[in-house]
Amino acid sequence: MIDFSKLEYPYPYIPVEKRYDILPEHSICSIAPAEESSDDFITGNGALRVQASGRPYTEEMAYTQELLYEPLWEKTPLPPDLRPYLPEIRRLLLEGKPEETDKLLDEAQKKAGFDKYMNFDNKILYPTGSPRLHTAFWLSFTQPEQSDTRDYLRWLDTQNGMITSIWTNARGAFRTDSFAAYDGDVIVNRLSAPEGQLDVDVSITPPGRPFKHGNMVFKNPFVKSTHELTIEGGMITLAWAYNPDFGHKGFVAAIRLLPEGGTMEKIEKGFSIKGATRLTVVSKIVKFESDFTFACKKAVQDELAAMQVDFDKLLQGNEKHIGERMDRSRIHLGKKEDEVLSGEELLRRTHSDKEIDPTLMDKLYDMGRFFQIYETGALPPMMGQHNINTNLQVCAGNNTGLFDEMDVYFRYCETKFDDFRTNAKLLFGARGLLASVHCDPDSGLYYHFSRTYPHYCWTGCLGWVYNELWGYYLVTGDKEFLRTRLIPAYKEMALFFEDYACDRGPDGKVIFYPSFSPEDPTPNPGYETVTCASINPTRINTVMDIAICREILTNLIDGCKTLGIEQENIPHWEKQLADLPTYLLDQEGGLKEWAWPTIEENYNHRHVSHHYDVWPGRAITPETEPELTEAIIISNRKRGQQDDSAHGIIHRALTAIRLKDMEEAMQNMSQLFNHGFVRRTLQASHFPYRGVFPDLTGAVPAFLVEMSVFSMPGIVEFLPAMPDYLMHGSIDGVWLYTVAKLEHMEWNEHGAKAVLTSGKAQTLTLRCRRKGARILVGGTELPMDGDAATYAFREGETVQVEILF
């Protein structure tokens, strides 16, 4: 038999029974330092981020600021003018010649000068990437190694964002704390030791380490960058000037060291502290978008030098900002006594049990919401693209009350409308808005071009983003938001689709072309994974874009009717809606990804873009579209995985949860939680056991909300997809897509009790699919119609709902 207590870790760790008096109530802990940066804890305040490995004697922390994107150019280039090529492109597509279509598009892009931005890897042509957030600097904290180190533990407090590591050796107990303060906009580190026992060298490493992703080595963006490093007066200052070819941009990082006791001496890249009891390090990073010179450092140095550093007060400010947001929504599936288990222990339990560990899910729920809080500053989460990555990273924000964070996501797109109009005009000769798929804090212009990834032919990008704005309207009922921010944008999106989908097929329906279904077919790891004959991605009638266009038009019409405006235009939009292409089924009755009869399906593909109407959309439910529900259950189950990237598995899981296909939902969730996508700090990976990528991090709260309660206008469904083994739990704070809020719900094998508040006067259908379920409101049993009952709410009314199984 295996003695699990004897599993080897770098240091003897604090046992479970001793953690109850150490760990904060809401925390995620680890029993070993990170061996690679992917297992660091990460925290931030929106603008600033810091990650820590927790290594006692060789700690190296990475610091950055949200605006430090590697510059690609001084001014974003205009997209190529494809208008002269469009008639020929469309003719070739209708004639079934996608390869010639791709060649023609490729020629047009290269003539416009975009070939210099493309990258070749394994004979696959990649477009230029989005600007990449880079590290401002690394700080190394080097202490004398001790052979008798024990009682190790590190954790992240999700109520205030503080990362802590503790250990003991012959010299006594040591501790390191790190957080990014909202007050003062600084990163704070504090190293504590027994009196007079802190000996530490603090040294800086500037940016410029090589970056490699798979077989691709990214070009060094700092070839022409220059910097100035000064170490004096207890302060390390890095002034960094970017390539002057890209404008006079740069940043200043000032790092102030405040030892308590002992001595401090200058060393080559920092300071050496001897015989101290405590060391506080305060760092400030400021980006300059123009007129940068090394002289800019003085103002930053002066500001930091004048700052009154009160560690506890700064931490209290974080508790107020983060803690209040975290307390808005919680889920409790696991046992209270298990909350002190480490990520390593929780993963070991879920790997050895037949079910996903409930406490692991509780902590992933917290981690997902904490991620959106600390990652949102002037910019929203920005890792990946807007074709599923960022969408997943924020997808639980509306339901769990992170409205300030969601507004940053909304405004990020709203500020780029002029660029979106340019995209629509030059790429398709259309009026209206065409959003860019890539994340760029400075520009919404399309520059993401290659034959392999024709994302500019994915016309639904902005519609998916606006699914979240519409979701905000559904949970709040904010009609001013509807009037001023939704309707004007939807009108321009509808205008784009009117011009883009202007030709008609043999059935009289409009044609979406050239069209791209993200990202089909994708060459990862190679085209040998593609199951259809053609590997050319530019095609006709992607179902995703048809679904998004339908959602745009439907929401536009409904919104205008609600406001009593634009009545003269509604018949035009209704005609546009009626002219959309009809979906097609394959031989098994599964929904096809392309609504064009001659296009073959590629089943081994990591995206399920054509399931948009189920999630994130709400057009298809078992009640509203039973036949399409069955078709999507089939297509969801048939999907291969291509390259094991998380986002496709996530979308399949969310599709299955919405359709109440429990076997498929749990199979996909099991793969995500058990097979290398969750790291021991409970951060997530894009590929199993490789790196950190937050798609799953942002999506887990959505999983658990949707399993607990489904909502759409006029409908609230309780426990729609909760597996039997999780039939003891509770959830607090879920904003519902019908201007209502689930204040609290708890459940067991006998039934559920919920507190529900309606933000408006409305009659709600209350549903529970459990066999024989009865529904009571305020102690009065309601008449059932199948699995549902109705109740007429007054505006602001809060009721007790009881469901008996």
Question: Regions from the language model: what does each represent?
Answer:
Residues 37-68, 72, 119, 384, ...:
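C-terminal capping/lid segments that line or modulate ligand- or cofactor-binding pockets
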